[in-house]
A protein has these predicted regions:
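Solvent-exposed loop/turn segments at secondary-structure junctions
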Residues: 52-54, 81-84, 98, 112-116, ...
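Solvent-exposed, acidic/flexible segments
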Residues: 32-39, 55-63, 85, 133-141, ...
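Structured segments of extracytoplasmic/periplasmic soluble domains
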Residues: 45, 49-52, 65-73, 115, ...
């Protein structure tokens, strides 16, 4: 039940964060303590750091801010050199007092970098400028930052890992291998024990749209099964 409460909080946060004016949703979120205003304010903080391009001072400031404001977690910087970038993943762990080598794990993840160029901007004068990253990058971090305030109070029976990955959005549209570099590095360094203990991996990304639409997607192997339901 305690783990389900965390999952419910996360799911509600993805609804309540961009639409905090909804009375029905907010009354539920109040019970679970997720504060959409806190999350929104943290987006402002992130944007004020500047573009979070891998290796930048803004990236370092964001990592330091996250660690300093959420000291209940055991934080670790995980640097890599991939695709021409010096990137740094940030991983924090919160373990129950009775944790063992077999305690199950829930991973909550988001990327914190912002793209180095806005090639889709309708203003041609802006296409070579970095994006602010309020939604793409900032919104996922905001949800995890607010959840990191709540989680230590829930007395969960799982280990909770918060993972902020770097160099996710710096790739070339012509080469899929140049994207999600931080996540690839993290995944490649997971041990078999880590994999066996992981009960859930939840990725939060781009949930800050004013007109948020969340679509259900299925692996190809499930398409026929879903269509028959």
């Amino acid at each position: 039940m305690r783990t389900m409460a965390l999952l419910a909080t996360l799911l509600l946060s993805t609804v309540a964060f961009p639409m905090i004016a909804s009375a029905d949703v907010c009354s539920t979120v109040d019970v679970l303590e997720f504060d959409g205003n806190n999350a929104n304010e943290s987006v402002t903080t992130q944007v004020e750091f500047g573009p979070r391009i891998p290796g930048s001072n803004a990236s370092m400031e964001l990592r330091n801010w996250f660690m300093e404001t959420r000291p209940e977690f055991d934080w670790r910087l995980d640097p890599h050199h991939r695709g021409g970038y010096n990137l740094t993943n940030l991983e924090g762990k919160l373990t129950p007092l009775d944790s063992t080598d077999e305690t199950p794990v829930i991973v909550l993840a988001a990327h914190y970098d912002s793209r180095h160029r806005a090639e889709r901007d309708p203003n041609p004068d802006m296409t070579e400028q970095p994006i602010p990253g309020a939604n793409d990058g900032g919104s996922g971090v905001a949800v995890l930052w607010e959840l990191a305030r709540i989680i230590p109070t829930l007395n969960l029976d799982h280990e909770i890992w918060i993972l902020l990955t770097d160099a996710e959005d710096q790739g070339s549209n012509d080469d899929p291998s140049t994207w999600v570099l931080g996540a690839r590095a993290w995944a490649e360094n997971q041990t078999q024990d880590d994999i066996n203990r992981t009960d859930a991996f939840l990725l939060v990304d781009m949930i800050g749209d004013a007109d948020l639409k969340i679509y259900r997607t299925f692996p190809p192997s499930l398409n026929n099964e879903e269509g028959n339901r």
